Amino acid sequence: MYLDINWEEDSIPENERGSLTGLLEQGIAKAVHLSAESEEAEVSLTLVDDARIHELNRDYRGVDRPTDVLSFALQEERSDEPDILDYEDHLLGDIIISVERARAQAIDYGHSFERELVYLAVHGTLHLLGYDHMEEEDKEEMRRQEEAVMSQIGLLR
């Protein structure tokens, strides 16, 4: 598992980044292993502020507001592929997370910032693997996968 983290958002002190990096690596690696049954994957994770994710959300999705997480898969699922993607080259894509949204949501949901940040990374990884939550059945499956990963790494609600 290779995770490249870009710390564009400077509200996370240098001395906290090491422990967060470990948790993020665990979460993403577990999501890949559970969903794609692989230990090998490459993901780029960028932590940004609300202004930057708002810009990206507007430019790439046509939604003119900030969001918590965006995922950009390097390979898109085609109609002749299985529902859950399995990449031979292991390059999954990019995940962008708003640190401001993660902090606010952690407060709203009554759990730690670390848990929320890792949850968003897991959520983004599952999108890279082909999961979605547009239909209720798909949403339930995605939530099961998210909770399984979070439970395995001990970051429960």
Curated annotation (Swiss-Prot):
- Does Nuclease count among this protein's keywords? yes
Q: What class of enzyme is it?
A: hydrolase
Q: Which Pfam families match?
A: YbeY
Which Gene3D superfamilies does its entry note?
Metalloproteases ('zincins'), catalytic domain
Annotated GO MF terms:
metalloendopeptidase activity; RNA endonuclease activity; zinc ion binding
The EC number on file is: 3.1.-.-
Swiss-Prot/TrEMBL keywords: Cytoplasm, Endonuclease, Hydrolase, Metal-binding, Nuclease, Ribosome biogenesis, rRNA processing, Zinc
- Name the principal localization, coarsely classed: cytoplasm
Whether Cytoplasm counts among this entry's keywords is: yes
Which Gene Ontology terms of cellular component type are present? cytoplasm
Compartment annotation: Cytoplasm
Q: Which family does it belong to?
A: Belongs to the endoribonuclease YbeY family.
Per the entry, what this protein does is:
Single strand-specific metallo-endoribonuclease involved in late-stage 70S ribosome quality control and in maturation of the 3' terminus of the 16S rRNA.
Q: What is this protein called?
A: Endoribonuclease YbeY
Gene that produces this protein: ybeY
